Curated annotation (Swiss-Prot):
Function: Regulates the transcription of genes required for cell separation.
Organism: Schizosaccharomyces pombe (strain 972 / ATCC 24843) (Fission yeast)
Name of the molecule in the record: Metallothionein expression activator
Keyword Electron transport listed: no
GO molecular function, one term: RNA polymerase II cis-regulatory region sequence-specific DNA binding
GO CC, one annotated term: nucleus
Database matches in PROSITE patterns: ZINC_FINGER_C2H2_1 (PS00028), ZINC_FINGER_C2H2_2 (PS50157)
Length: 533
């Protein structure tokens, strides 16, 4: 582009500025400056150091039309506009369209170059967008105040630029074409015309400069999974024909809006969809997860159980927890090592959540509190024992009337860690019959000078019960009495299976450890020392 003339005073100032700032300029000053006739008129090309001057309309002075044809601008505008640009105003199609169809400059610039550019209101003011490293002082001849005084004396205005171009009557070298007009008489809702969300899918692509009337691709929103392209507005007149869905090669599904989660707080406004400003986001209420079902294996995996593999067939026929517990009590006599659960909540959990849907492979035994009989006087001990024998006498039942005889009792299997004996001796009397623990950690029996040393307190109390004939557990077959329940249970095996362990002296024993102790005493021919000799 060419700018205009300067006064002689401005020319002198520019000559001094050129000598000082010549290393920063890449122009050929011999070509940029040409003298035409009078020394008061000089034409020059637009370059960066005149940023402060050309930004004002009164500082723009058009040159004569005869000199426009012979002028060529040497400045490279690609670094400013980012697009190829023809300095000749006549060859710019965007300005042709703006003059022919009366479109604003913003539409022509956005379609011809880039939507992000901010188009100038006049073709001459684009030079003011060039930023250089030049710095101007207020005392310079080209400052704002001096340039206003210099150009105001001449009296030219920037509006004369277009009038002089029109008077030139130059022939345009580009082809002419018709631009379709949009008829909006039959459109019920004219807002659809300015809304880019409604775009007909059958509008063909135009070729040539006619594409300037359509929005560029950068103005349209990018498609993603949250956006669906709606159909054409209902009242729009058929400019290019209605969209033909039959010609498509795939099935088009009905568009449905997306509803992302609204994360805004109640104090703030609701979130707006980043895709379309018309789509409101819907807040989704969170749903509580379902409660996990009761699992039999995981809930009772931490409990130790007594397994009865011989009675699996009988347990498989049960249908309720009550029948299962009663059936287990009948076979409790064969349980050597039971389970004692001291927590009372496990018993409630067993009856409420235990699902009896599969054959039972294990049983859970809980502890029942046993009565403790106390006496106030020593004389009442004998009658109390007789009454207690009647109440705790076990019942002998035959199972399937087949030998050997199985005997069941009301007492369930216990571990040795818990008390399985019934003591009818007052605690004060019991405490006076032993002392300890001693230095070695053992207790000493004080009954009639027994002085037996026992390691555990539980065992020394059971030992004192034998001195006082406090044997609450009785055998119905041989009338033998025992202090502890497991001693009676071990005694009953003699009646069922006999004494399986026999010494060489023909003495029989119920347990193997009893036989080994008998042999270690060396009181018979089966002694350990006698075998070695």
């Amino acid at each position: 582009m060419s700018l205009s003339y300067l006064s002689s005073s401005s020319q002198k100032s520019f000559e001094s500025f050129r000598q000082e700032e010549s290393p920063a300029c890449n122009h050929s000053y011999q070509r940029d400056y040409e003298t035409f006739g009078d020394s008061k008129h000089t034409s020059f090309s637009s370059f960066a150091p005149f940023e402060n001057e050309v930004s004002l309309n009164q500082a723009v002075i058009p040159s004569p039309p005869s000199h426009l044809q012979n002028f060529q601008d040497q400045f490279d505008y690609s670094s400013v506009l980012k697009t190829p640009f023809n300095p000749l105003l006549e060859a710019n199609s965007a300005y042709f369209l703006s003059n022919q169809i009366s479109l604003p400059d913003s539409h022509s610039y956005a379609s011809s170059f880039d939507a992000s550019l901010s188009p100038p209101s006049s073709p001459l003011t684009c030079v003011s967008q060039i930023h250089t490293e030049q710095n101007f002082n207020n005392n310079d001849a080209f400052s704002l105040t001096n340039s206003q005084q210099a150009f105001s004396e001449i009296g030219y205005d920037a509006s004369n630029w277009i009038d002089e171009l029109d008077s030139q009557q130059q022939v345009l070298s580009f082809p002419e074409f018709d631009i379709p007009e949009i008829k909006t008489e039959t459109c019920s809702n004219k807002d659809h015309l300015e809304n880019f969300d409604y775009l007909s899918s059958s509008i063909p692509e135009t070729s040539g400069p006619a594409s300037s009337v359509l929005p560029s691709s950068s103005q349209l929103e990018s498609f993603n999974e949250f956006m669906f392209l709606p159909s054409s507005p209902p009242g729009l007149d058929e400019i290019n024909g209605a969209p033909s869905f039959e010609e498509l090669n795939f099935q088009i599904s009905q568009p449905s809006p997306a509803h992302p989660v609204d994360l805004s707080s109640p104090e703030t406004a609701p979130n707006i969809s980043p895709v379309s400003p018309f789509a409101q986001l819907v807040k989704l209420e969170p749903t509580s997860p379902q409660k996990p079902s009761f699992a039999l294996d995981s809930s009772f995996s931490h409990l130790d159980v007594c397994r009865h593999t011989d009675n699996q067939k009988a347990f498989a026929k049960l249908s309720s927890p009550a029948e299962y517990v009663s059936e287990f009590e009948k076979f409790s006599s064969v349980c050597d090592h039971g389970l004692d659960i001291s927590n009372a909540n496990i018993n409630n959990t067993l009856t409420q959540q235990f699902a009896l849907s599969a054959p039972y492979e294990s049983c859970i035994v809980t502890k029942k509190p046993e009565p403790c009989i106390t006496v106030k006087e020593e004389e009442q001990l004998a009658p109390k024992i007789e009454s207690a024998d009647l109440s705790i006498t076990p019942q002998v039942t035959e199972h399937d009337s087949k030998p050997p005889v199985r005997i069941s009792y009301d007492h369930r299997c216990k571990t040795r860690k818990q008390s399985t004996r019934i003591c009818r001796i007052p605690p004060e009397t019991m405490a006076s019959l032993y002392c300890g623990p001693e230095a070695d950690g053992k207790y000493v029996c004080l009954y009639n000078g027994c002085n037996k040393r026992i390691a555990r307190k539980y065992n020394v109390e059971s030992h004192i019960q034998t001195h006082l004939s406090d044997r609450p557990y009785r055998c119905d077959l041989c009338k033998a009495g025992f202090v502890r329940h497991h001693d009676l249970k071990r005694h009953l095996r003699i009646h069922e299976n006999g004494r399986p362990y026999v010494c060489e002296c023909l003495k029989r024993f119920n347990r193997l450890d009893a036989l080994n102790r008998h042999k270690q005493r060396n009181i018979c021919v089966g002694g350990v020392d006698r075998r070695q000799h």
